A protein has these predicted regions:
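N-terminal active-site segment of His-dependent metallophosphoesterases
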Residues: 1-30, 38-56, 120-123, 149-151
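Short, solvent-exposed aromatic-acidic interface loops
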Residues: 137-149
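Divalent metal-coordination and catalytic microenvironments
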Residues: 9, 14, 24, 35, ...
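Active-site donor-binding loop signature of nucleotide-sugar glycosyltransferases
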Residues: 54, 64, 110-112, 129, ...
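Conserved beta-sheet core of the metallophosphoesterase superfamily
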Residues: 31, 70-133, 137
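Acidic, His/Gly-enriched loop-helix segments that form or flank divalent-metal centers
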Residues: 23-26, 37-103
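Glycine-/small-residue-rich active-site loops that bind phosphorylated ligands and cofactors
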Residues: 16, 67, 115
Length: 151
């Protein structure tokens, strides 16, 4: 029920298996990037990065971006090329939303909904995008990492 009012779902990598992609794509308009734990099966379905402008807001998503304001070379090149308003990344599995003053963008890591990683609470982010603005940003907590339900 958490995704019922969503028009688009983005997954920032470490999918794990094709069944997760199938379930998301069957339920919603979904885009994703592969993560470092994802094998060839996932890497042939999802790209390394996604850039999309939605309602006038430019989003860049890549699994491993590096530390905020000190991104890795690949991410810096993508930021330079696309000039995103928002950088969505995964990898750490730790929820973080912070304004990046150096690169003039919003850095977002939604955390992780799965049970693998360093996170203690399973999380994801929801937001509205309309007329060039983001609004109603919510960090949704799904319970402790050992809890397996996601309705």
């Amino acid at each position: 029920h958490h995704l019922a009012d969503c028009d688009l779902v983005w997954h920032a990598g470490d999918v794990g298996n094709n069944q997760v992609i199938d379930a998301l794509e069957n339920a919603k308009n979904t885009q994703g990037v592969f993560g470092n734990i994802d094998g060839t099966e996932i890497r042939t379905r999802w790209p390394e990065f996604v850039f999309e402008e939605i309602e006038g807001v430019k989003f860049l998503m890549i699994h491993i971006a590096g530390a905020i304001e000190r991104y890795n070379e690949k991410t810096r090149a993508l930021i330079s090329k696309y000039q995103p308003d928002v950088l969505v990344c995964g990898h750490s599995h730790i929820l973080k939303v912070k304004r990046d003053q150096r690169f003039k963008l919003m850095h977002m890591n939604p955390g992780a909904v799965g049970n693998h990683g360093f996170h203690k609470v399973r999380t994801f982010l929801k937001l509205d995008v309309e007329n060039g603005k983001m609004a109603n940003l919510q960090a949704v907590e799904l319970g402790p990492r050992s809890s397996k339900s996601f309705d």
